[in-house]
Amino acid sequence: MPDRSHLQSGKDAERQALEHLQHQGLRLLAQNWLCKRGELDLVMLDGDTVVFVEVRYRKNTQWGGALDSIDGRKRQKLIFAAQYFLQRESRWANSPCRFDVVAIDSHQDQLNWLQNAFDS
């Protein structure tokens, strides 16, 4: 990815992740969904499964790659936000759910899609 501000690089990574997942057959339900408990980058539907997708981009792997950047605290924030999403969007409340991560490391110029990255 081009050398841009951190925010723009993140937006580019989300766009790239969204295009990849849609190409794989997932359908977008929400993007950058905000609540008091956090933000969900992408909420998608894979068949009947609601998929909460965290997109991580790393320009530099000096402190670890994109996948390494999701620690226990970040996972907990995502779980809380997903629970709130399901409360607010009740039509999806009884659907199976999973948490995926799309990790993009610029030095490898590669997108890694990790399905079921962690459990709630």
Swiss-Prot record:
- Name the residues that span the membrane: none
> What domain of life?
Bacteria
| A molecular-function term among this protein's GO annotations | nucleic acid binding
The cross-references to InterPro entries, in alphabetical order and at most eight, read:
Restrct_endonuc-II-like (IPR011335), tRNA_endonuc-like_dom_sf (IPR011856), UPF0102_YraN-like (IPR003509)
One short Pfam name that applies is UPF0102
Q: Which cysteines are joined by disulfide bonds?
A: none
Q: Which family does it belong to?
A: Belongs to the UPF0102 family.
Check the record and name the PANTHER family matching this protein.
Answer: UPF0102 PROTEIN YRAN
Output this protein's name: UPF0102 protein Pfl01_4685
